[in-house]
Amino acid sequence: MEGLKKKIFGVCLKNDLAQTRNETKGIHYGLMTLETSKQLQEFLHLLVIKREVIQNFELLFHIINVAVKITDSNLPSDDIWHFILKLRFSSEINIDEDSKVLNYLLETGIAMENPVSWKCLAVISSILSSVPQSKKIITNLIETEHAKKIGQLFDNIQDLQQGNFLVEILSNCFKKSASNSKKVEKIPQLWQSRSKNKFFFENEFYPFSSKNGSLQTCQFLCNNFMSTLSFTGILRQVSYSGSETLKNLRIFKKKDDENSYFIQCIYNKIYLWLDEKAPLEFERKKIRITKNLKNKIQIKLRQPFHECVRTTADKTALLFNKTKGFQLEFEDEKLGETFFHNVNNIPKISEVQNFLVLDYIEEEPENEGEEEEQIGRADEQKEDEEEESLDELSTPMVYPIKSSIPHNHNEKVQLVTPDRSVSIRSDEWDLKSNTEDEEGNVLADLKISSTKETKRQTDYVHIDSEDQSPVVSAQMRKMRRESTKTLEILRQEFKDKDVQNKEDQSEQIQNPFVNTSSLVVGKSCLVNPKEKPNIDQTVVGITELKSNSSIKKRDINILDTIFGQPPSKKQKQFHKKEKKKQQKKLTNFKPIIDVPSQDKRNLRSNAPTKPKSIKVSKLRTDKKVTGEKSSPETAAEKVDDQTVRSNDEQAMSRATKEKCFPDVNEGKEITKDDAKVSLESKKNNETFVDSSVVEKHTPPDKDCNNCNITDILESTTVIDLQSPHGLSAPGQNTFTNKLQEQIYSSINHFSNELVRKISIINQELNKKILKELSEKYQKLFSELQDNFQNDTNEMLKFMGEIKDMMNLPEDQLVHAIRTRKFDNNKR
């Protein structure tokens, strides 16, 4: 032991009841290495085995100091602290009033986010119970030096173990006057607020001379600091088993049946508090955490208990010596699910948990005067563009490093992301000045609201030119030039379009649009409809209103490419699908009555057939008999018939219907071109009607033989045909209604049955998969993980043995590598 002391500390420290001395004199620590860690572990192991009692705080100070430095160097230190917590102290040990050992332990113990803080407090707790004279010194250190730091720790406490030992120390140093009383003899000023100190120490759950891990201590922490304690849960029941499948579970019981258990996952370890002595410390890498079908969490040990779990309670370690796993039942199932999710989703090293808030990005003030000044600066930069030199562009930019704590006036300022980026001010196109033509007429369709322009001004984030780099300024000037050039091109295009629109207006007035919706498809002849006066003026007026607008489809498409997205074709496809559905539904109709003759007549047609690629609608047309050309009066009457349906057309006499039987002729496909429909209709003396218009025109003054009965119907229209026997249509409608009801009911019944069977299949499959397959594959995956872990461990061991093979000849080296096996440590 003496040799180990000299290797570790540089001097041979004595463990005797000596007088107080300078505890740090003549000792200088060098770089901590793995060898130092092993030597200290061996030294502490000998102290524990030989049951040595610490009689000098100088030795304890250097042991704690070296252990903390080894931990800070990320060297293996768990076993070192395990042996430190098992050290025993003499009750006659000499303690100075300003003991550096206790001060150092307190300072390290109340540090936040330190994995060994609670272990330093555990050492103080052990000294407090073993050395009676230490209580006065610890109380004085807390009041004078560490009170404020303890208050800050409780405001942000995360470690349940640290809180347990700290509350134990406080409850023994600042006791209640009685177990049932709320008064404390002397309250330390942990916070500046008296009410906060009073609430902490005079709380009904504040323990009376408690021990760490007791029910009072844990309840006090959970009731007051549960929101800050990370990954902490309260358990109702803890069971353990000696089998790997956790069968034949045994329930862990205390003397007091009302006690609860507490668990926390922190610093890549799991701490389970079962009694008042010490927690069970599980190594996260050496256990596997799962959940069974009853939502109970299971902790399975990958290795023997003493290799996976550490505890200073010898009786507890002896009880669980042959344990292979634990089963935990939480008081709150939701809390258990949260704990299970957090334990199995530990943040990786590369995962971002915090971020810095930059406070030097300021929004542009809303004052208009300041905006004008900023615009003036931009214009000055544009004029001085040619005067910039390469030396200015090559000068390094030095940006000040700001504090990560934002100021009050910039609390809500965020960095500009690509989705929220503001466009350059020069990208705002003033189309209002371009919408006026030469005659002063304003295009009605081009209206840009001022709200959009104001929104851009308020959202615009200004960055001062002093903070910009020359490269960024040059790029912004380039973008301004490009946008200005684009605006000039757009203005020229609008001027050219205005000239073309005026020429189109004159042509349209000379050749008015001939509306042919009043043409009626009759039996086999066409006659000139009744003349109506004063139609030319109406047609010219309508044409002027329609042609007055200079906006065409091409102009709208240009604006869509600038400000919006290309028009979707869903609407056209929807109309086509709707027409197809109507066609399919009505062409399958079969009337009940017998019609003498429904054969389609082969009629001639002088109308040219349009190509199918630009098909608009399908109409039923009859052969044109008369060769007369339609006059302007006829065209005028057609326009009138399209706008208003007359009362004479709606009231058709039954006598006329009985004498004249219009035949259902074959429908012909007629297409319409947007640019040439009016000219071709006038030359060929025929009309093209939209499929959505259905009109009937029959002059009541003339006989059926001398008139033209016209029915403009869709290809899917059902004509009310009358048989010679005079059967009526209501019977036919009743039959179709009943047939539709039967079809609907049968389809509805079939769909309901199908949905019910599918739901049954889903439920049964889910149950079968959860019960039978989940446990099977969980076991397979766990075995796979174990095998993979064993193989990797064997590979690491083999890599460590390579250095011993460097002295072998080549043949023996190849033979040794090839014969090496990674199964059960066999070669």
From Swiss-Prot:
Probable constituent of the synaptonemal complex during meiosis. May interact with HOP1. Required for meiosis I chromosome segregation. Residues 364-373, 381-391 have a biased composition (Acidic residues). It comes from Saccharomyces cerevisiae (strain ATCC 204508 / S288c) (Baker's yeast). It is found in: Nucleus. Keywords: Meiosis, Nucleus, Sporulation. The gene is RED1. Residues 364-393, 563-655 are annotated as: Disordered. Residues 569-584 have a biased composition (Basic residues). One of its GO terms (cellular component) is condensed nuclear chromosome. The keyword Transmembrane does not apply. This is Protein RED1. GO terms for molecular function: chromatin DNA binding; identical protein binding; structural molecule activity. Residues 619-648 have a biased composition (Basic and acidic residues). One of its GO terms (biological process) is meiotic recombination checkpoint signaling. The keyword Heme does not apply.
